[in-house]
Every structure is written in structure tokens, then in C-alpha cells.
Amino acid sequence: MSTSVTLNLHLISDSTCETVASVARSALEHFRSVEVNEFVWSFINNNEQIDKIMSLIEKDKYNFIMYTMFDDELRRYLKQKAGAQEIPCIPVLSHVIREISCYLHIKKDPYISTNIGLDDEYFTRIDAINYTIAHDDGQNLWDIDQADIIILGVSRTSKSPTSIYLAYRGYRVVNIPLVHSINLSVDLSNMKNKLIVGLTIDIDRLIEIRRTRLVSMKNQNNYQYVDYEHVLMEIKETKRICVQNGWPIIDVTQKSVEEIAATIIQYFNKMQH
């Protein structure tokens, strides 16, 4: 597959889509060169909703469906419709459920309420997700004091996916891009009770990721974005700012989003004690 391919990933669930989204993002960590358009379809519980989804899928694109559904009839209907359009349709939990069932020699429960998790914790997560999306890439910093975590880093260091992953865990996150020779647009010196984390990465890996990004955007003429000396200055500036302010730095070179987030959560928990 060409590195410039864009995948339309459709996440479908009869519940909140949190499980299928988590599995999908873990899997996609192994394909960082692929540009992904993510479509989330939650609380799907009848054939008409599936028909609507299938009608909205662009036929001339690379499409991929991942889903969690506990109703056997609905699951079969989705697979039938996806098969008719020759779209891969992968159940993310079926194999695990089947293995547990076989091992224990019992059948799975025929029905699971889709209201599971719709409690205060669920709505806290929704609030965190909304806040984090609104504050992606340095946007809307006027209420940055409402954040739990602030992430800094140069372009393409996994700031946004890490922020969203943390939001799914209930943390309100702001991520701010660091651009060489441009001062931060907000004063973070008075954020003493906030966890501020810097993300860094191996320069060769960063340039590779950026080159792939430029190819996918058909913007190969942006030479400065992948110029070794310029990128090196960006990375050094990030480290300088973080060291100067006593903020922890995480090297994301060999880390998945889950690993980055887990490290950030550890720092956050230490601050609370």
C-alpha cells in the first residue's frame, strides 16, 4: 500500500464506541504512515441505521469497518451489507468472547444493556472529550486553566492522538504546538497546579513522519518542515523550554499512544499526592 493512501475507518457499535475506538487506535499505531479519516457510529441498534451508514460510505475510497455488536441478527446484517460492498468488516471482540465461551463451556449472555456506563463517569469523559477537541493544536486557550494536563511539542509528535486518548480516560487536555522562533501564545509560568508535559522524538524518525505527511498532502515543496538543521533546532528548543521550567519530557520515538498516555497519567497521579 502506498504511503499516501487514506483509509476511511468506520467504527460501529450498539453502545458508546469506546471499546472499538480503543482497539482501532491501538492497531493503527502499527501503520503510522497511513492517513486515517475516522467515522464513529454509536448506539446503532436496527437495520435502518446500518442502511443509512452504508449509504453514506464513499464507494471509491479505501473503507474499513470495525465494530462491536451483541445482537447476532444485527451483526449478521451488518456483515451482509458490508460484504455486498466488498468492505472489510471486523468484529473486535468476537474472537475473545468465543475463546472464553469455549474454555468455560458456557454460552455468552444473549443481551447486554447499551446503557452500561452511562453514569457520572461516562458524562465526565464526554465533557473531557469535548474540551480536549476544542483545545486541540493550541486553540481556545482563554480557558486553559480548566485543563488537567497541558501537552507541548513540535509538529507530528503524537500530541493530538495522545490528548484524545487521555480525554477518553476522563482528562481535560490542551495540546500546544511549539514552533521554532515563535513564542508561546499563552503564559504557562503561573500554571503551578497543572501537569505540563513536553513530547520529543528522534530527529530521523520525526523527519520520516513529516515527509510522509507532506506526500499525503501533496506538499513536498515545504523544505523547511523536513530540513535537518531546522528540525534539530525545533527539538532542542522544546527540550530547553521544558528543562528551564522543570516540566517532564517524554521521548515518544518507540512509544505507542497508549504508552505515552500511561506515562503522562503516572506523572499526573504523582502530582496529586
Swiss-Prot record:
The keyword Transmembrane helix does not apply. It comes from the Bacteria. ADP binds at G153, V154, S155, R156, T157, S158, K159, S160. The keyword Transferase applies. InterPro entries: Kinase-pyrophosphorylase, PPDK_reg. Keywords: Kinase, Nucleotide-binding, Serine/threonine-protein kinase, Transferase. It catalyses: N(tele)-phospho-L-histidyl/L-threonyl-[pyruvate, phosphate dikinase] + ADP = N(tele)-phospho-L-histidyl/O-phospho-L-threonyl-[pyruvate, phosphate dikinase] + AMP + H(+); N(tele)-phospho-L-histidyl/O-phospho-L-threonyl-[pyruvate, phosphate dikinase] + phosphate + H(+) = N(tele)-phospho-L-histidyl/L-threonyl-[pyruvate, phosphate dikinase] + diphosphate. Bifunctional serine/threonine kinase and phosphorylase involved in the regulation of the pyruvate, phosphate dikinase (PPDK) by catalyzing its phosphorylation/dephosphorylation. This is Putative pyruvate, phosphate dikinase regulatory protein.
